From Swiss-Prot:
Chain positions recorded as Mg(2+) binding sites: 198
Membrane-spanning intervals of the chain: 15-45, 60-87
GO BP: ATP synthesis coupled electron transport
Signal peptide: none
Protein name per Swiss-Prot or TrEMBL: Cytochrome c oxidase subunit 2
Mitochondrial intermembrane side: 1-14, 88-227
Cofactor stoichiometry and binding remark: Binds a dinuclear copper A center per subunit.
Catalysed reaction equations from the record: 4 Fe(II)-[cytochrome c] + O2 + 8 H(+)(in) = 4 Fe(III)-[cytochrome c] + 2 H2O + 4 H(+)(out)
Role of this protein: Component of the cytochrome c oxidase, the last enzyme in the mitochondrial electron transport chain which drives oxidative phosphorylation. The respiratory chain contains 3 multisubunit complexes succinate dehydrogenase (complex II, CII), ubiquinol-cytochrome c oxidoreductase (cytochrome b-c1 complex, complex III, CIII) and cytochrome c oxidase (complex IV, CIV), that cooperate to transfer electrons derived from NADH and succinate to molecular oxygen, creating an electrochemical gradient over the inner membrane that drives transmembrane transport and the ATP synthase.
Binding-site residues for Cu cation A1, renumbered to this chain: 161, 196, 200, 207
Main location class: mitochondrion
Keywords assigned: Copper, Electron transport, Magnesium, Membrane, Metal-binding, Mitochondrion, Mitochondrion inner membrane, Respiratory chain, Translocase, Transmembrane, Transmembrane helix, Transport
Amino acid sequence: MAYPFQLGLQDATSPIMEELTNFHDHTLMIVFLISSLVLYIISLMLTTKLTHTSTMDAQEVETIWTILPAVILILIALPSLRILYMMDEINNPVLTVKTMGHQWYWSYEYTDYEDLCFDSYMIPTTDLKPGELRLLEVDNRVVLPMELPIRMLISSEDVLHSWAVPSLGLKTDAIPGRLNQATLTSNRPGLFYGQCSEICGSNHSFMPIVLEMVPLKHFENWSASMI
């Protein structure tokens, strides 16, 4: 989860988020190098009155500043395309969960189980227990098995929503009349928080998402107790 004054991304919990973090660092380094070069050239132009007459009309320079940006864009695009294809892969999910966005709560249905469905509302600040997080706790958490591929089917009952869990690298739009899907795999157990990430009305800020990733045995015990 995020912390006050945090500058970086949240700790990666899924393979996809690890790839996104590496891509972020890769792209940021390229941007940093380009920005440093541009600032260096600007400082030279401001601190010297000398000019090189041949650079005002130099075919070689124009060729270089055409080819070099193209190479840099390719270096950014190739890892990005690889991650996009990874995010679209569906590797035989062991579990499918359907989530529907409402104003202003989420409902979940475990499609592999009969009658295993519930609504998930934010817990009001006045009802929080010591140690719980304001605007992020819910009355019913989404319990899922860790280290296994899970498919999420996401849609909406009313307006546009967006189901997002940053530490898993997930953000999928919930669109009325359309069923979007995403896959997630958690590398470790724990609680992972997210929120609706699409403006959906006056209580948009009060639609938290809480995933509880547990070992498979604990998940089986939980699902048996819920049915």
